[in-house]
A protein has these predicted regions:
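Short, charged low-complexity linear segments at domain edges
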Residues: 351-381
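Flexible coil/turn residues that form the inter-helical turn or adjacent wing/linker of helix-turn-helix
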Residues: 163, 226, 370, 419, ...
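Helicase motor core with emphasis on the C-terminal RecA-like subdomain
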Residues: 3-10, 14-18, 22-44, 51-55, ...
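Accessory DNA-binding and partner-docking regions appended to nucleic-acid-acting proteins
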Residues: 1-3, 355-357, 384-596
Length: 596
């Protein structure tokens, strides 16, 4: 049997997506690979199809239990002999699974890196001829990456312990340094690298200065989205609860998700989000990696992510079905201070902290870039594209203004107050605020006191952010977040450099100009009623089987059913995502709704 037959007869798809076939054929020729593929490009098929064609068993390394469980449920629905081993299962179950894999009864076995590299598992696998190790989220092995995990580094031993096994590594986010590090550690540079590109044309990007009324900014972004699924990322557990409560009072259907919740509640909230439409999950970064919900229509951040890689991964959870999806990032000076503080408090070595700070600098530069958001984002991954004409900067190009004198005001306030105060104090000096701290320090008597009072506090926050992004000032976390002047800042203060800044918009309703009234799903209004009925049927079946709804059929398959309206089993078998197993199980039930 060939790859095309597996695609048609097992997975129920007619054609491969871009790049899939070449990766699969390379693996079938027994060569190691690293595939960098954007979210939603279908990377799981790239290792699942070869695993079914190899005569021996394959092991998939996955970091999350939830992801393993979902993948196994999906594969079993297709009639594939697949299993997983993890700590949430009993020792008896795990032992039986391992024995079945050794006997050849299981073709695909999912393991976490910790489980795989344990002495016990390696001992059990030592006499097995394993065809392939497929490593998902492979960027976690690299110290160059933003998501380095020590347990992933142990995987570098696989090529020595199992020299005949193919190593297939997959990731959605890896710049050149990270890619080189992955193939060095996993394959000693003996791998073919596939880089499909990082662009997600269906995503629209926007960044806004976070105001005091940032929840109202969020509310405006959510206009016309009440029936859509979305994710809102917050920095703290407390904030997730607060935002979810705020949205529920505004008649949205929002649920919080964070590591501090009871495990059962957290699991129930995740299942609700996965199985139902119109749910907004308000989460910390504990949520998301490996979440396979295709119809997430928006992702919003209420504060700064940790890096460009983290931001790219998190917004990548929107629009996996290829339909338009929106993203919004709100951030302010305090977010930047918090992120710098997190890095400083981390127990990692100085080199790692330096790398984390550089990644944060890159994200800050992206946020303040006056050019196309997609151009700015993808340039970080060494990819050049034309302007997207779909982000806030393309739809409303920002004005660039001459700001040398304003910059000198801020720099002078920092210098004259001794470079030992944070942004709040510096802004109070510029505004001429007679606060107790200002008076106590005598800063109401320095020349720059009140020199910037014709501008607002929000303006100065945005302006100082741009100066930070330009590298003229820096935040010294070791000295309690004080602002300090850099070498280029000194040159600017001495009039040896000029400074232009992006016009600072302080309107909280800016968002409404950037977003379309309705997200098109490429389906006629007359078919929406049938689509709703098919989704209802899917939910009923999924609940009866205790599996996520997407395991039954993806949204894309349901949309195709609603549009094409298959009359019989032959027509139904032509729907993408309908293989022999699902045809047998579900065709009669779904056809009765379609033709009823």
């Amino acid at each position: 049997m060939e790859a095309q037959q597996i695609l048609n007869n097992v997975f129920g798809y007619n054609t491969f997506r871009t790049g899939q076939e070449e990766i699969i054929n390379t693996l079938l020729s027994k060569k190691n690979i690293l595939a960098v593929m954007p979210t939603g490009a279908g990377k799981s098929l790239c290792y699942q199809i070869p695993a079914l064609l190899f005569s021996r068993g394959s092991i998939i390394v996955s970091p999350l239990v939830a992801l393993m469980d979902d993948q196994i449920l999906s594969l079993k629905e297709l009639g594939v002999s697949a299993e997983r081993i993890h700590s949430h299962l009993s020792e008896e179950q795990n032992n039986k699974t391992l024995q079945d894999f050794k006997k050849g009864l299981i073709k695909i076995l999912y393991l976490s890196p910790e489980n795989l590299m344990s002495d016990r598992t390696l001992y059990a696998l030592q006499d097995i001829d394993i065809a392939m190790f497929a490593i998902d989220e492979a960027h976690c092995i690299s110290k160059w990456g933003a998501s380095f995990r020590p347990q992933y580094e142990e995987l570098s031993k696989l090529s020595q312990i199992f020299p005949d096994a193919i190593i297939a590594s997959f990731t959605a986010t890896a710049d050149k340094n990270t890619r080189d590090d992955i193939v060095h550690k996993l394959c000693n540079y003996n791998a073919k690298i596939f880089v499909q590109g990082f662009d997600r044309p269906n995503l629209s990007l926007a960044v806004e200065q976070k105001t005091k009324n940032w929840k109202e900014q969020l509310l405006i972004f959510l206009e016309n989205k009440k029936n859509n699924s979305g994710i809102i990322y917050c920095l703290s557990r407390k904030e997730t609860e607060s935002v979810a409560d705020f949205l529920n009072k505004k008649t949205f259907n929002a649920i919080p998700y964070h590591a501090g919740q009871d495990a059962i509640l957290r699991k129930n909230n995740q299942n609700k989000f996965m199985n139902e439409d119109g749910i907004i999950i308000v989460a910390t970064i504990a949520f998301g990696m490996g979440i396979d919900k295709s119809n997430v229509r928006f992702v919003a951040h209420t504060s700064l992510p940790s890096s460009i890689e983290a931001y790219y991964q998190e917004i990548g959870r929107a629009g996996r079905d290829g339909n338009p999806a929106e993203t919004l990032l709100l951030y302010g000076l305090n977010d930047l201070f918090q992120r710098r503080r997190f890095i400083e408090l981390d127990k990692s070595d100085d080199q790692h902290k330096l790398g984390e700070n550089k990644r944060l600098d890159s994200l800050l530069a992206y946020c303040e870039a006056p050019i196309c958001r997609k151009k700015a984002l993808l340039s970080y991954f060494d990819e050049e594209i034309e302007s997207c004409n779909n982000c806030d900067n393309c739809l409303q190009p920002p004005k660039m203004l001459e700001g040398t004198e304003l910059a000198q005001m801020a720099l002078s306030a920092i210098y004259r107050s001794g470079q030992v105060f944070g942004a709040v104090h510096i802004i109070n000096i510029l505004l001429g605020e007679n606060s107790p701290k200002i008076i106590e320090r005598g800063h109401n008597k320095i020349k720059t006191f009140g020199i910037g009072k014709e501008h607002s506090k929000d303006f100065w926050q945005g302006f100082i952010r741009q100066m930070l992004a330009s590298g003229h000032i820096t935040i010294n976390i070791k000295k309690f977040g004080c602002l300090q002047i850099t070498t280029t800042g000194v040159q600017l203060l001495k009039n040896e450099l000029q400074f232009n800044y992006k016009e600072i918009e302080l309107k909280s309703h800016k968002t409404t100009k950037n977003y379309k009234e309705k997200i098109p799903l490429n389906i006629q209004d007359s078919d929406l009623e049938l689509l709703a009925a098919l989704k209802k049927l899917r939910l009923t079946i999924s609940k009866s089987l205790s599996v996520p709804a997407f395991v039954i059929f993806s949204d894309a398959s349901l949309i195709e059913m609603a549009k094409l309206k298959p009359k019989d089993q032959i027509d139904f078998s032509k729907i993408n995502g309908v293989g022999p197993s699902k045809l047998k199980k579900y065709s009669d039930t779904f056809l009765s709704v379609i033709n009823g």
